[in-house]
Amino acid sequence: MSDQIYDSVHADLDPFKKILNVIPGFKGYVERQARRDSDKLLREMVSSRFEEQWQRISALQRDLISQGDIALIDDLEGPAIKIRTFADRIRRATRGYSSLFEAVKINEAELTQLYQYDAKLLDLAGEVARAVDNVETSIGSDGLQAAIRNLRSVAQQCIEVFDRREEIFTSAPQTPA
């Protein structure tokens, strides 16, 4: 998925930029800019998927209020805040993650690792959706508290994976959990 976004951004270069690619040093600049643009597109897509889940949790909270289950609102608020904060962090992160593509020379192994984290973030969006589905189907049953704990755990895992992704270029090699 990340490669497709990067290729799309890179293919959209106007003729002027294609000509400037032959100027020494400029090609690297264009490459870094294309990586920043693809990074931003990917982050917006991931963020919107998590915002959808946050909206679903908010709707569940409203349903619980209308049913008079006010005590459960606080239980869902923790995971809702984590997911909303996570979506905001992704969307509002500096392009290229704080000049990630400028300050550090990216080698192929690091780039591969970065894309593995991107794939994991997309997988986690699916895990959050399944956890929200589980909460929704558990309303009114004895399994609701367990479903909420699972949602809280998955929300925390999202934050941890994102934190590890940002550390790719500042620490020893890791793999997404």
Regions picked out by a protein language model, each given a short descriptive name:
Residues 53-150:
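Charged linear interaction tracts used for macromolecular binding and regulation
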Residues 2, 51, 81, 149, ...:
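A broad, low-amplitude sensor of folded, mature protein cores
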Residues 27-44, 80-82, 111, 118, ...:
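Residue-level signal for functionally critical sites in structured catalytic/ligand-binding pockets
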Residues 1-61, 65:
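Leu/Val/Ala/Ile-rich N-terminal alpha-helices, chiefly Sec-type signal peptides and the beginnings
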Residues 138-177:
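Preference for long, well-ordered alpha-helical segments
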